[in-house]
Structure formats: C-alpha cells, structure tokens
Amino acid sequence: MLWQRLAVVEWAALAWELLGASVLFIAVRWLVRRLEKRPRDLNRCGTLSSPPSASEAVAAQPGEVTMDAMMARLKLLNPDDLRKEVMKAGLKCGPITSTTRFIFEKKLAQALLEQGGLLTSSLPKPSAVTAMAFIQGTSRTPPSVDGKQTQQACFSEDRDFGYSVGLNPPEEEAVASSVHPVPFSASTRNDNHKAGVTAPKEPLVYYGVCPVYEDGPVRHERIHVYEDKKEALQAAKLIKGSRFKAFRTREDAEKFARGICDYLPSPNKTTPLLSPVKAVPLGGSDGLKADGLCLAESETVNKERANSYKNPRTQDLTAKLRKAVENGEEHTFSDLIWSNPRYLIGSGDNPTIVQEGCRYNVMHVAAKENQASMCQLTLETLENPEFMRLMYPDDNMDMLQKRILYVVDLYLNTPDKVGFDTPLHFACKFGNVDVVNVLSSHPLIVKNRKNKYGKTPEEVICERSQNKSPALKERIREYLMGHYYVPLLRAEDTSPVIGELWSSDQKAEASNTAHCRSSPRDPVMTLRAFVGPLSPSKAEDFRKLWKTPPRKKAGFFHSIRKSDPERGIERVGRELAHELGYPWVEYWEFLGCFVDLSSQEGLQRLEEYLIQKELSKKAQQEIRENEGCLQDRTSDFGSGKKYSNSISVGAFLDGDDDSSLEEIKNQQNTVPSQSQPTTDKFQTSKSGSLPLGQKVDPGETSVGTYPDKGRNGFCHPLNHRTADGRGLEATNGEEALPPPVSVLTQELNKLNLQSLGDSLHETPDKNGKLEDEVLPSRKGAADSDLLASPPAIASLGKKQVRTNTEVSEAMAEMSLGPKSPQLGVQAGLEPILSSATVDSTKRLFLSGEEPSKLDRDVLAALECANIDPGLYPAIHRWKSTVMCYSPSDRQSWPSPALKGKFTTELVDLDCSHSCSGRCSPAGSSPSKPGHTSSSSGLHSPGRYSPAHGRHFQRVAHVARLAAL
C-alpha cells in the first residue's frame, strides 16, 4: 500500500511540473510575439545618410504629417511593397487590386498615424530623384536631404492612363517617364519654410486638341493647345469630331493639334510605322530630335487617311440591323451595310456584334431565325471586293482578298459567348434546312467544330425543334456530309462527257495536276449541265444511272441520245433528275445562265426574255411604220398616178391611166398561176409582212380601211391611197419610180434564179400545194401566222434598193395563190384575213423570225411544267404558236446558228479517268462570280456550285495559303 501511495505522489508531481513548463513556454511565446508586433525603432541608426522616419518627422514637427500626405506617400508604392508594409503593421492583407488598393492604403495610413511609424524598406535613396522618377513601372519619391522638410508624394494630374491618349496610345513606361517627380517635401512644406525654396510656375502638361482636317490646317488657323485640362475638354466638346492628348512639351502638343505624325500607314505599305510616341520617348531630353521621321519642314506629312465611316450606335445595330435580319428585309439590310460598311465589319476586321451578352453577329441571328436569304446575301456582300474597298480604299487586291477570307471565316465559324455555338450549330439545332444548305456549301465552313458541351453540328440536329420530320433531319445530315455535283461536259465538237464527282471541299491541286497533264491536242471541255447538290452516295449512284440508264427505258433514252446529238444527253439527265427529285440545271445560250426551265425561276427568266423580245419587235415595227408614213408624206406632193391597194394593171402599163376596173381585175387574176411557187417567200421578210384582205374597189379603198396598220407597225406606200382614190407615184419625194414593167421583170428573173437554189429545200407539187414543205401544219392551224422567209430570200431583199424591195413586196401581195387568203371580195374570207393580219405580228420564236431547234428543245424542257396563262402570258403565246406545228415538222426545224464558241464557265475538273481535256480560261464565262446577285433564288446554282468552280477553287487555294 505504501509503495502504491509513493507512485501516485510522484506521478502527480511530474504532472504539475509539466503543466508549469507548458504555461511558461506559452508565456514566453506570447511575449516574443508581442515584441515582434511592436514597431521597430527607426531612430537607432544615427547616421545622416539614412532617411529619417515619419515618427521623427512627427516628433520634430508635430501636426504636419496629415492623412492626405500619408495617403499620397502610400500611392507611390507598388503592390508588393504595400503588401509588406501592411503585414508589418500587423494588419490582415488580401489581394491588392485596383479596387481594393485604396482600402488597404487607408487602413495602413491610419495604423501608421496611430503608431507614429512610417515606411522603412520602401523608401528610395535621395539620389533616385535625379536618376529616374519611376522604378519598375511605379513612382518612388525619396525624401529630401534637408531634414527640416517634410515628405509628401508627387503625382501627375492625369493619373488615369488611356483617358486622353488619342488613337495611338503610348506605352505605359513612356507615359510614366513623361511625368517629372517633385520631392515629397515640396508638397508638404509648412508656411514657415515656403520662402526658402519656390516651385516653378510653368505647367508640366500641355493638351493639344486636334480637329478633323480635310486637307490640313489653314495657315492662319488657330492651333488649339491648352495648359488646363478643363479648357482642353471644353474645346474638344465645341469642335465636332476632335480629340485631345496630353504632351510633355508644347512643341509636341502643337504638332498633334496640326495633325502631324498621327496616322499609321496601311498594312500594304512597306514604310516603317510612324508613331510620335513609339518613335521617341517623351521623357527624353532630346525630344523629337532623335528621330526625324516625325519632323517636316513644311509641317505636312504624306499620311493615309482612314475611311470616313463612323461606328454605328448600339441602338442602330439592335433596332435597325438586327431587326432587318430577323424579318428578312433584304433591301433595308443592303441599304444599311452599303451606306456604312461598319455595320458588318468592326474594329480589327471583326464581325460586328448585334446582340450584347450572347455576342451574336448577323450570321448567328440569321441562322437562328431561319433567314437563309440573309445568310447568302451577307456572304455575297462580304466576298465582294468593292464592299471591302469601302473600308480600305488604298489596299491592293491581294490585301483585300486576305481581309475578305479573314472576315468571312470569322462570320462562319465564330462561336457565341453562351454555348460556344457557331451559326451552323444554330441552323442544325433549330432544324433550318435552307440555312444549313447555304452554310455547309461554303468552302471556309468548319463542320466538326464542337460547342461548350462537346457536340458537333451533326449531333445537335433538331434539338430545339423536336417536331421536325425524319426526312428533314436526313436532308440536314446529307448537307453536312458534303455538296457533290455530277457535271456534264461538252467539247467544241459537242461530244458529251459525264465528268467525275465535283465538290466544293475538293482541293485545287488535283485539278491543277490534271490540267498540266492534258495534251494540247485534247478538245476544250465546257460545263453544260450538272445535277446537285447531292450526298456522296446519291451523286455516285446518279452518275452511274446517267451513264447507264435503267433497262426499262434504255431504248427510249438511247434513241434520244442518237437523234439529238446537241442536247440529247441533257434530256436524259433532266428526266432522270426530275424523276428522282434531284436539283437539275443546264446552260441556255439565249438566257446566258444555268437554270432549270421547268422551275419557277426558269419560267420567270423565260417570261422576261419573251416579253423583252416582243417589245423589241414592236419597237422595230413602229420605226418602220414611222419611216413609211414619213416617206408617204414626202411623196404625196409629187404623186400623179393612180394605184390600187393590190398591184393593179396600171402598174404594168407605162402611163395608161384610163384602164377600166374590169380590165385590171382580169389581168390581175392571170398573175397567181404564173408565180405561185415563189409567193409565200415574200409573206414575211425583214421589213415585215403586208396587210392582206383589202377590198379591190377603188371607191371603198382609203387610208381608213387599215384598222390594224398602226398596231402591226407597217405603213407601206404601195398599200396607201389618197382620199381621192389615187395612189402614190414615188417612194422618195424627189425621184419617180422606174418603169414598173422593167422593175418587175428584173424581180421575176431574180426570183427564178433564187427558186433554183431553193429547190433542195422545198419542191412544190403540180397543184401548187406548199403545206408539207413551206407551210407545215397549215391544215390544223387555220388562224396561225405565215411562215417566215428563208435566210436566202431575206439576204436577197437586203441587197436590193428600197424601191425594188417595195415593188417585190407588192408583187408578192399581188401573186398570192388560190389557197392564200388575199381576195376577200372573191373568196369571201375577209374576217379570216383580218385575224391573220393581226396574228402576223404576234409571231414569236426564240431565235430569229422563224422556228428553230431551240424552240423544240425549250418545248421539251417545259413538257412537265404547268404554265399558267395568267402568270406567264408570253410563254403561253409562244407555246401555242409552236404547238401549231406537227411533231414531224418540229423534227425538221434547223438548229440556230451558234454565236461563237461555247461561253460557259469552264471548270477545272479532275476528269483524267473519264475524259481527257483541258479547261479554257474563265474570262469568257457567262456566269462569273461577280455577276451573282442576291436576288437569285436559293434553288438556283449558287456561288459554290460547278457554275462558279473557278472562283470556288481560288477561294479555297487562298484560304489554304493563308493557313500555312
């Protein structure tokens, strides 16, 4: 028991000893911390070289160190030194930023004033005042050597960097070096010591105000240089468009106010950059003497002026531009961007933001609102060099192309700020298939870019529109797979070749290599038609189907290709494409473009062409009518002989005016049997057809018997009679006609010779029937117009003088056959003749005055089209005229004369496996990229189809070079 008690006592004593030792250790540690927290004694260094402390200054001159002076002193410290002083003062220190710095400065100043201490390690030596005002980007002002002076901080009036530095802001170090420091004691001197040292009165900063000069300042114009910042601000407000800037010397401010050395050269210039700030440091003692680039004896400089377009306001971008894009207002959109290109191109050639927060540009908004036409119009405008030249008028074409590629790439592939979605993401997400078609066809589009959630455009198809059909989703996927075309090429000898698949994603090297390997003897291949855009699999299947038609229609397609070597394979491809529902276009020379005539756009173009042709024909007829009427008036004064409406027998007699009417009729009836085979050749000539069906009675014949004369556009002197029943003697006003008998004899001889040359084309039978050779389908078209004259007869009429031509026309009118409706009195066909006269001016064909194979080809292209007479009246009239002829007659129509070579866009296709050929330059292209207008429909061949392949490859080639 005793042993146990001793053990307990020992353990208790040991525990008390340990507890006492712990308490002692804690007390010592507390005392050490208290000693560390006490401010250091700054008076222990008695040497004169060490800077005096703030406590000594306070003790020597109590009440002179104020809170403002302490705050000014602390502003000269950099963030690291300020953090050290805060820690030494025993205060908690967080991150020091531009917003929190003032809080820590104020706390530290209060603590130092309470403790009577000041900064120690951060104070610079007195020699630093004359050496440099700023060290490591921050101002450190040493105290004065004079111990009787108090220490204060000196800081510039313009502490906010970048407030008034103009267009070319200087470097931060340059601005820092431009401020001359003042000793800290100079600002905190007592009134008792102000008499000792006086500060200079000269201002430290000069403010130059630069107005907007058109051709430089006038010689006697005032130069705006101010010493007060408020005055400079007031002047800048009064002078519209001006800007001001702070300078160290008055000379620099005057140069700035005159507009000298203020503009930077264009990126295409090779001259060095001229900047008054970067060329010479403003704090240097040499001023601008070190670099003479900014000095000009005449104070003028060869500078490049920027464009005069101002940045649009945010309200205009939102209320005008974005609203026009959302509503699809193309005209308003075009007016805005062409009036100020900065609506599309912002600073740094970046897309203009039309919706802040999400940072949407025009392409984002158009893709989101399903405005495919606005996307296409935006791309076409940005790729127009003339539009970019508005922004950079001094750039050459190479620089403009680089800028265009840069801006277009940003518009197509810039993600938004919220979900990192590109315009293609928006189009796929909302199921806007037309927008996907436009965007995915561009060569600069990136189709596999991922958004914030790591999804590509293909993975977000119809995420925001779940009610879309599966067929539409499949179409979007096909567009994202690529746009492929099946082209049809033709050589100069019209031999067709179905080329390899063509896509906008193909590289240009392959086509260039094939171009170099082609032989000079190979024919030049031209693009005539193409199918697409299609997916790669569909394009390959259609190419095989086009080359080898299905067995059921193989015979029919084979007969078409053999019977029509000029456009047979186009007909086969057209029918296959329409049957499968694939886009199809072919080139038509008379329209000058690639188009599908059965589409709405094709019908509209054909309607415009026919209307223009009708107007042109009517204008020519009016000109002839005016000429004839003028000649009638001039010849009316010298007329002395009588002529009937038709050529009477008086025309065959030399001056016998007393012939009776019955003799005239008898001799007139003997003429048709002699010249029947050649009469119809004169029905329609280059000068027009004659009005038929006039009465023979001279008493009833007058000018008023031609109700349709003005409408038809003909006013022939031989068909006119004066009011007294007499005809006109001469066509000129001065010379009379030669003897009519001799003239008609010469004409008959010429016609006999001409009929021998025309015997190969037409052979009339004994009865004089010309329905099968000259007038096709006359049996089923009683009210159709007369067939146009052959080219040989037309050329013959051109070579004759006007008098002979008029007599020939009169003879043709006289010598109409029995089946030709000429004598209304005898045959009783006056109503029919009037309609024939009216319809003769409505004859309308696509090429010339007579039907040709072109009419047959266009009719075949419109076979499946539903033509509404109300919407397309001209097409309806043309089709009715062509359908009056039988199919066998239409097969015999000749091909129109080709006007030169094929002028289509010659595309460099890699057709070395299927054909050998080289492509001619694109200078003779009928569908140049520059001619593409925004009004073209989305279903017409776009800028990136084979119709514009050369432009396409050029863009891809330049983009590839830019990427390198």
From Swiss-Prot:
CDD domains: LEM_ANKL2
Bias type Polar residues, positions: 666-688
ANK repeat positions: 419-448
Domain LEM stretches: 71-115
Main location: endoplasmic reticulum
An annotated GO BP: cell division
Source superkingdom: Eukaryota
InterPro entries registered for this protein in UniProt: ANKLE2_3rd (IPR056237), Ankyrin_rpt (IPR002110), Ankyrin_rpt-contain_sf (IPR036770), LEM/LEM-like_dom_sf (IPR011015), LEM_ANKL2 (IPR035006), LEM_dom (IPR003887)
Membrane topology: Single-pass type III membrane protein
Pfam family, one: ANKLE2_3rd
Extracellular-facing ranges: 1-7
Subunit comment: Interacts with BAF/BANF1. Interacts with protein phosphatase 2A (PP2A) components PPP2C (PPP2CA or PPP2CB) and PPP2R1A.
Function: Involved in mitotic nuclear envelope reassembly by promoting dephosphorylation of BAF/BANF1 during mitotic exit. Coordinates the control of BAF/BANF1 dephosphorylation by inhibiting VRK1 kinase and promoting dephosphorylation of BAF/BANF1 by protein phosphatase 2A (PP2A), thereby facilitating nuclear envelope assembly. May regulate nuclear localization of VRK1 in non-dividing cells. It is unclear whether it acts as a real PP2A regulatory subunit or whether it is involved in recruitment of the PP2A complex. Involved in brain development.
Protein name: Ankyrin repeat and LEM domain-containing protein 2
Native species: Mus musculus
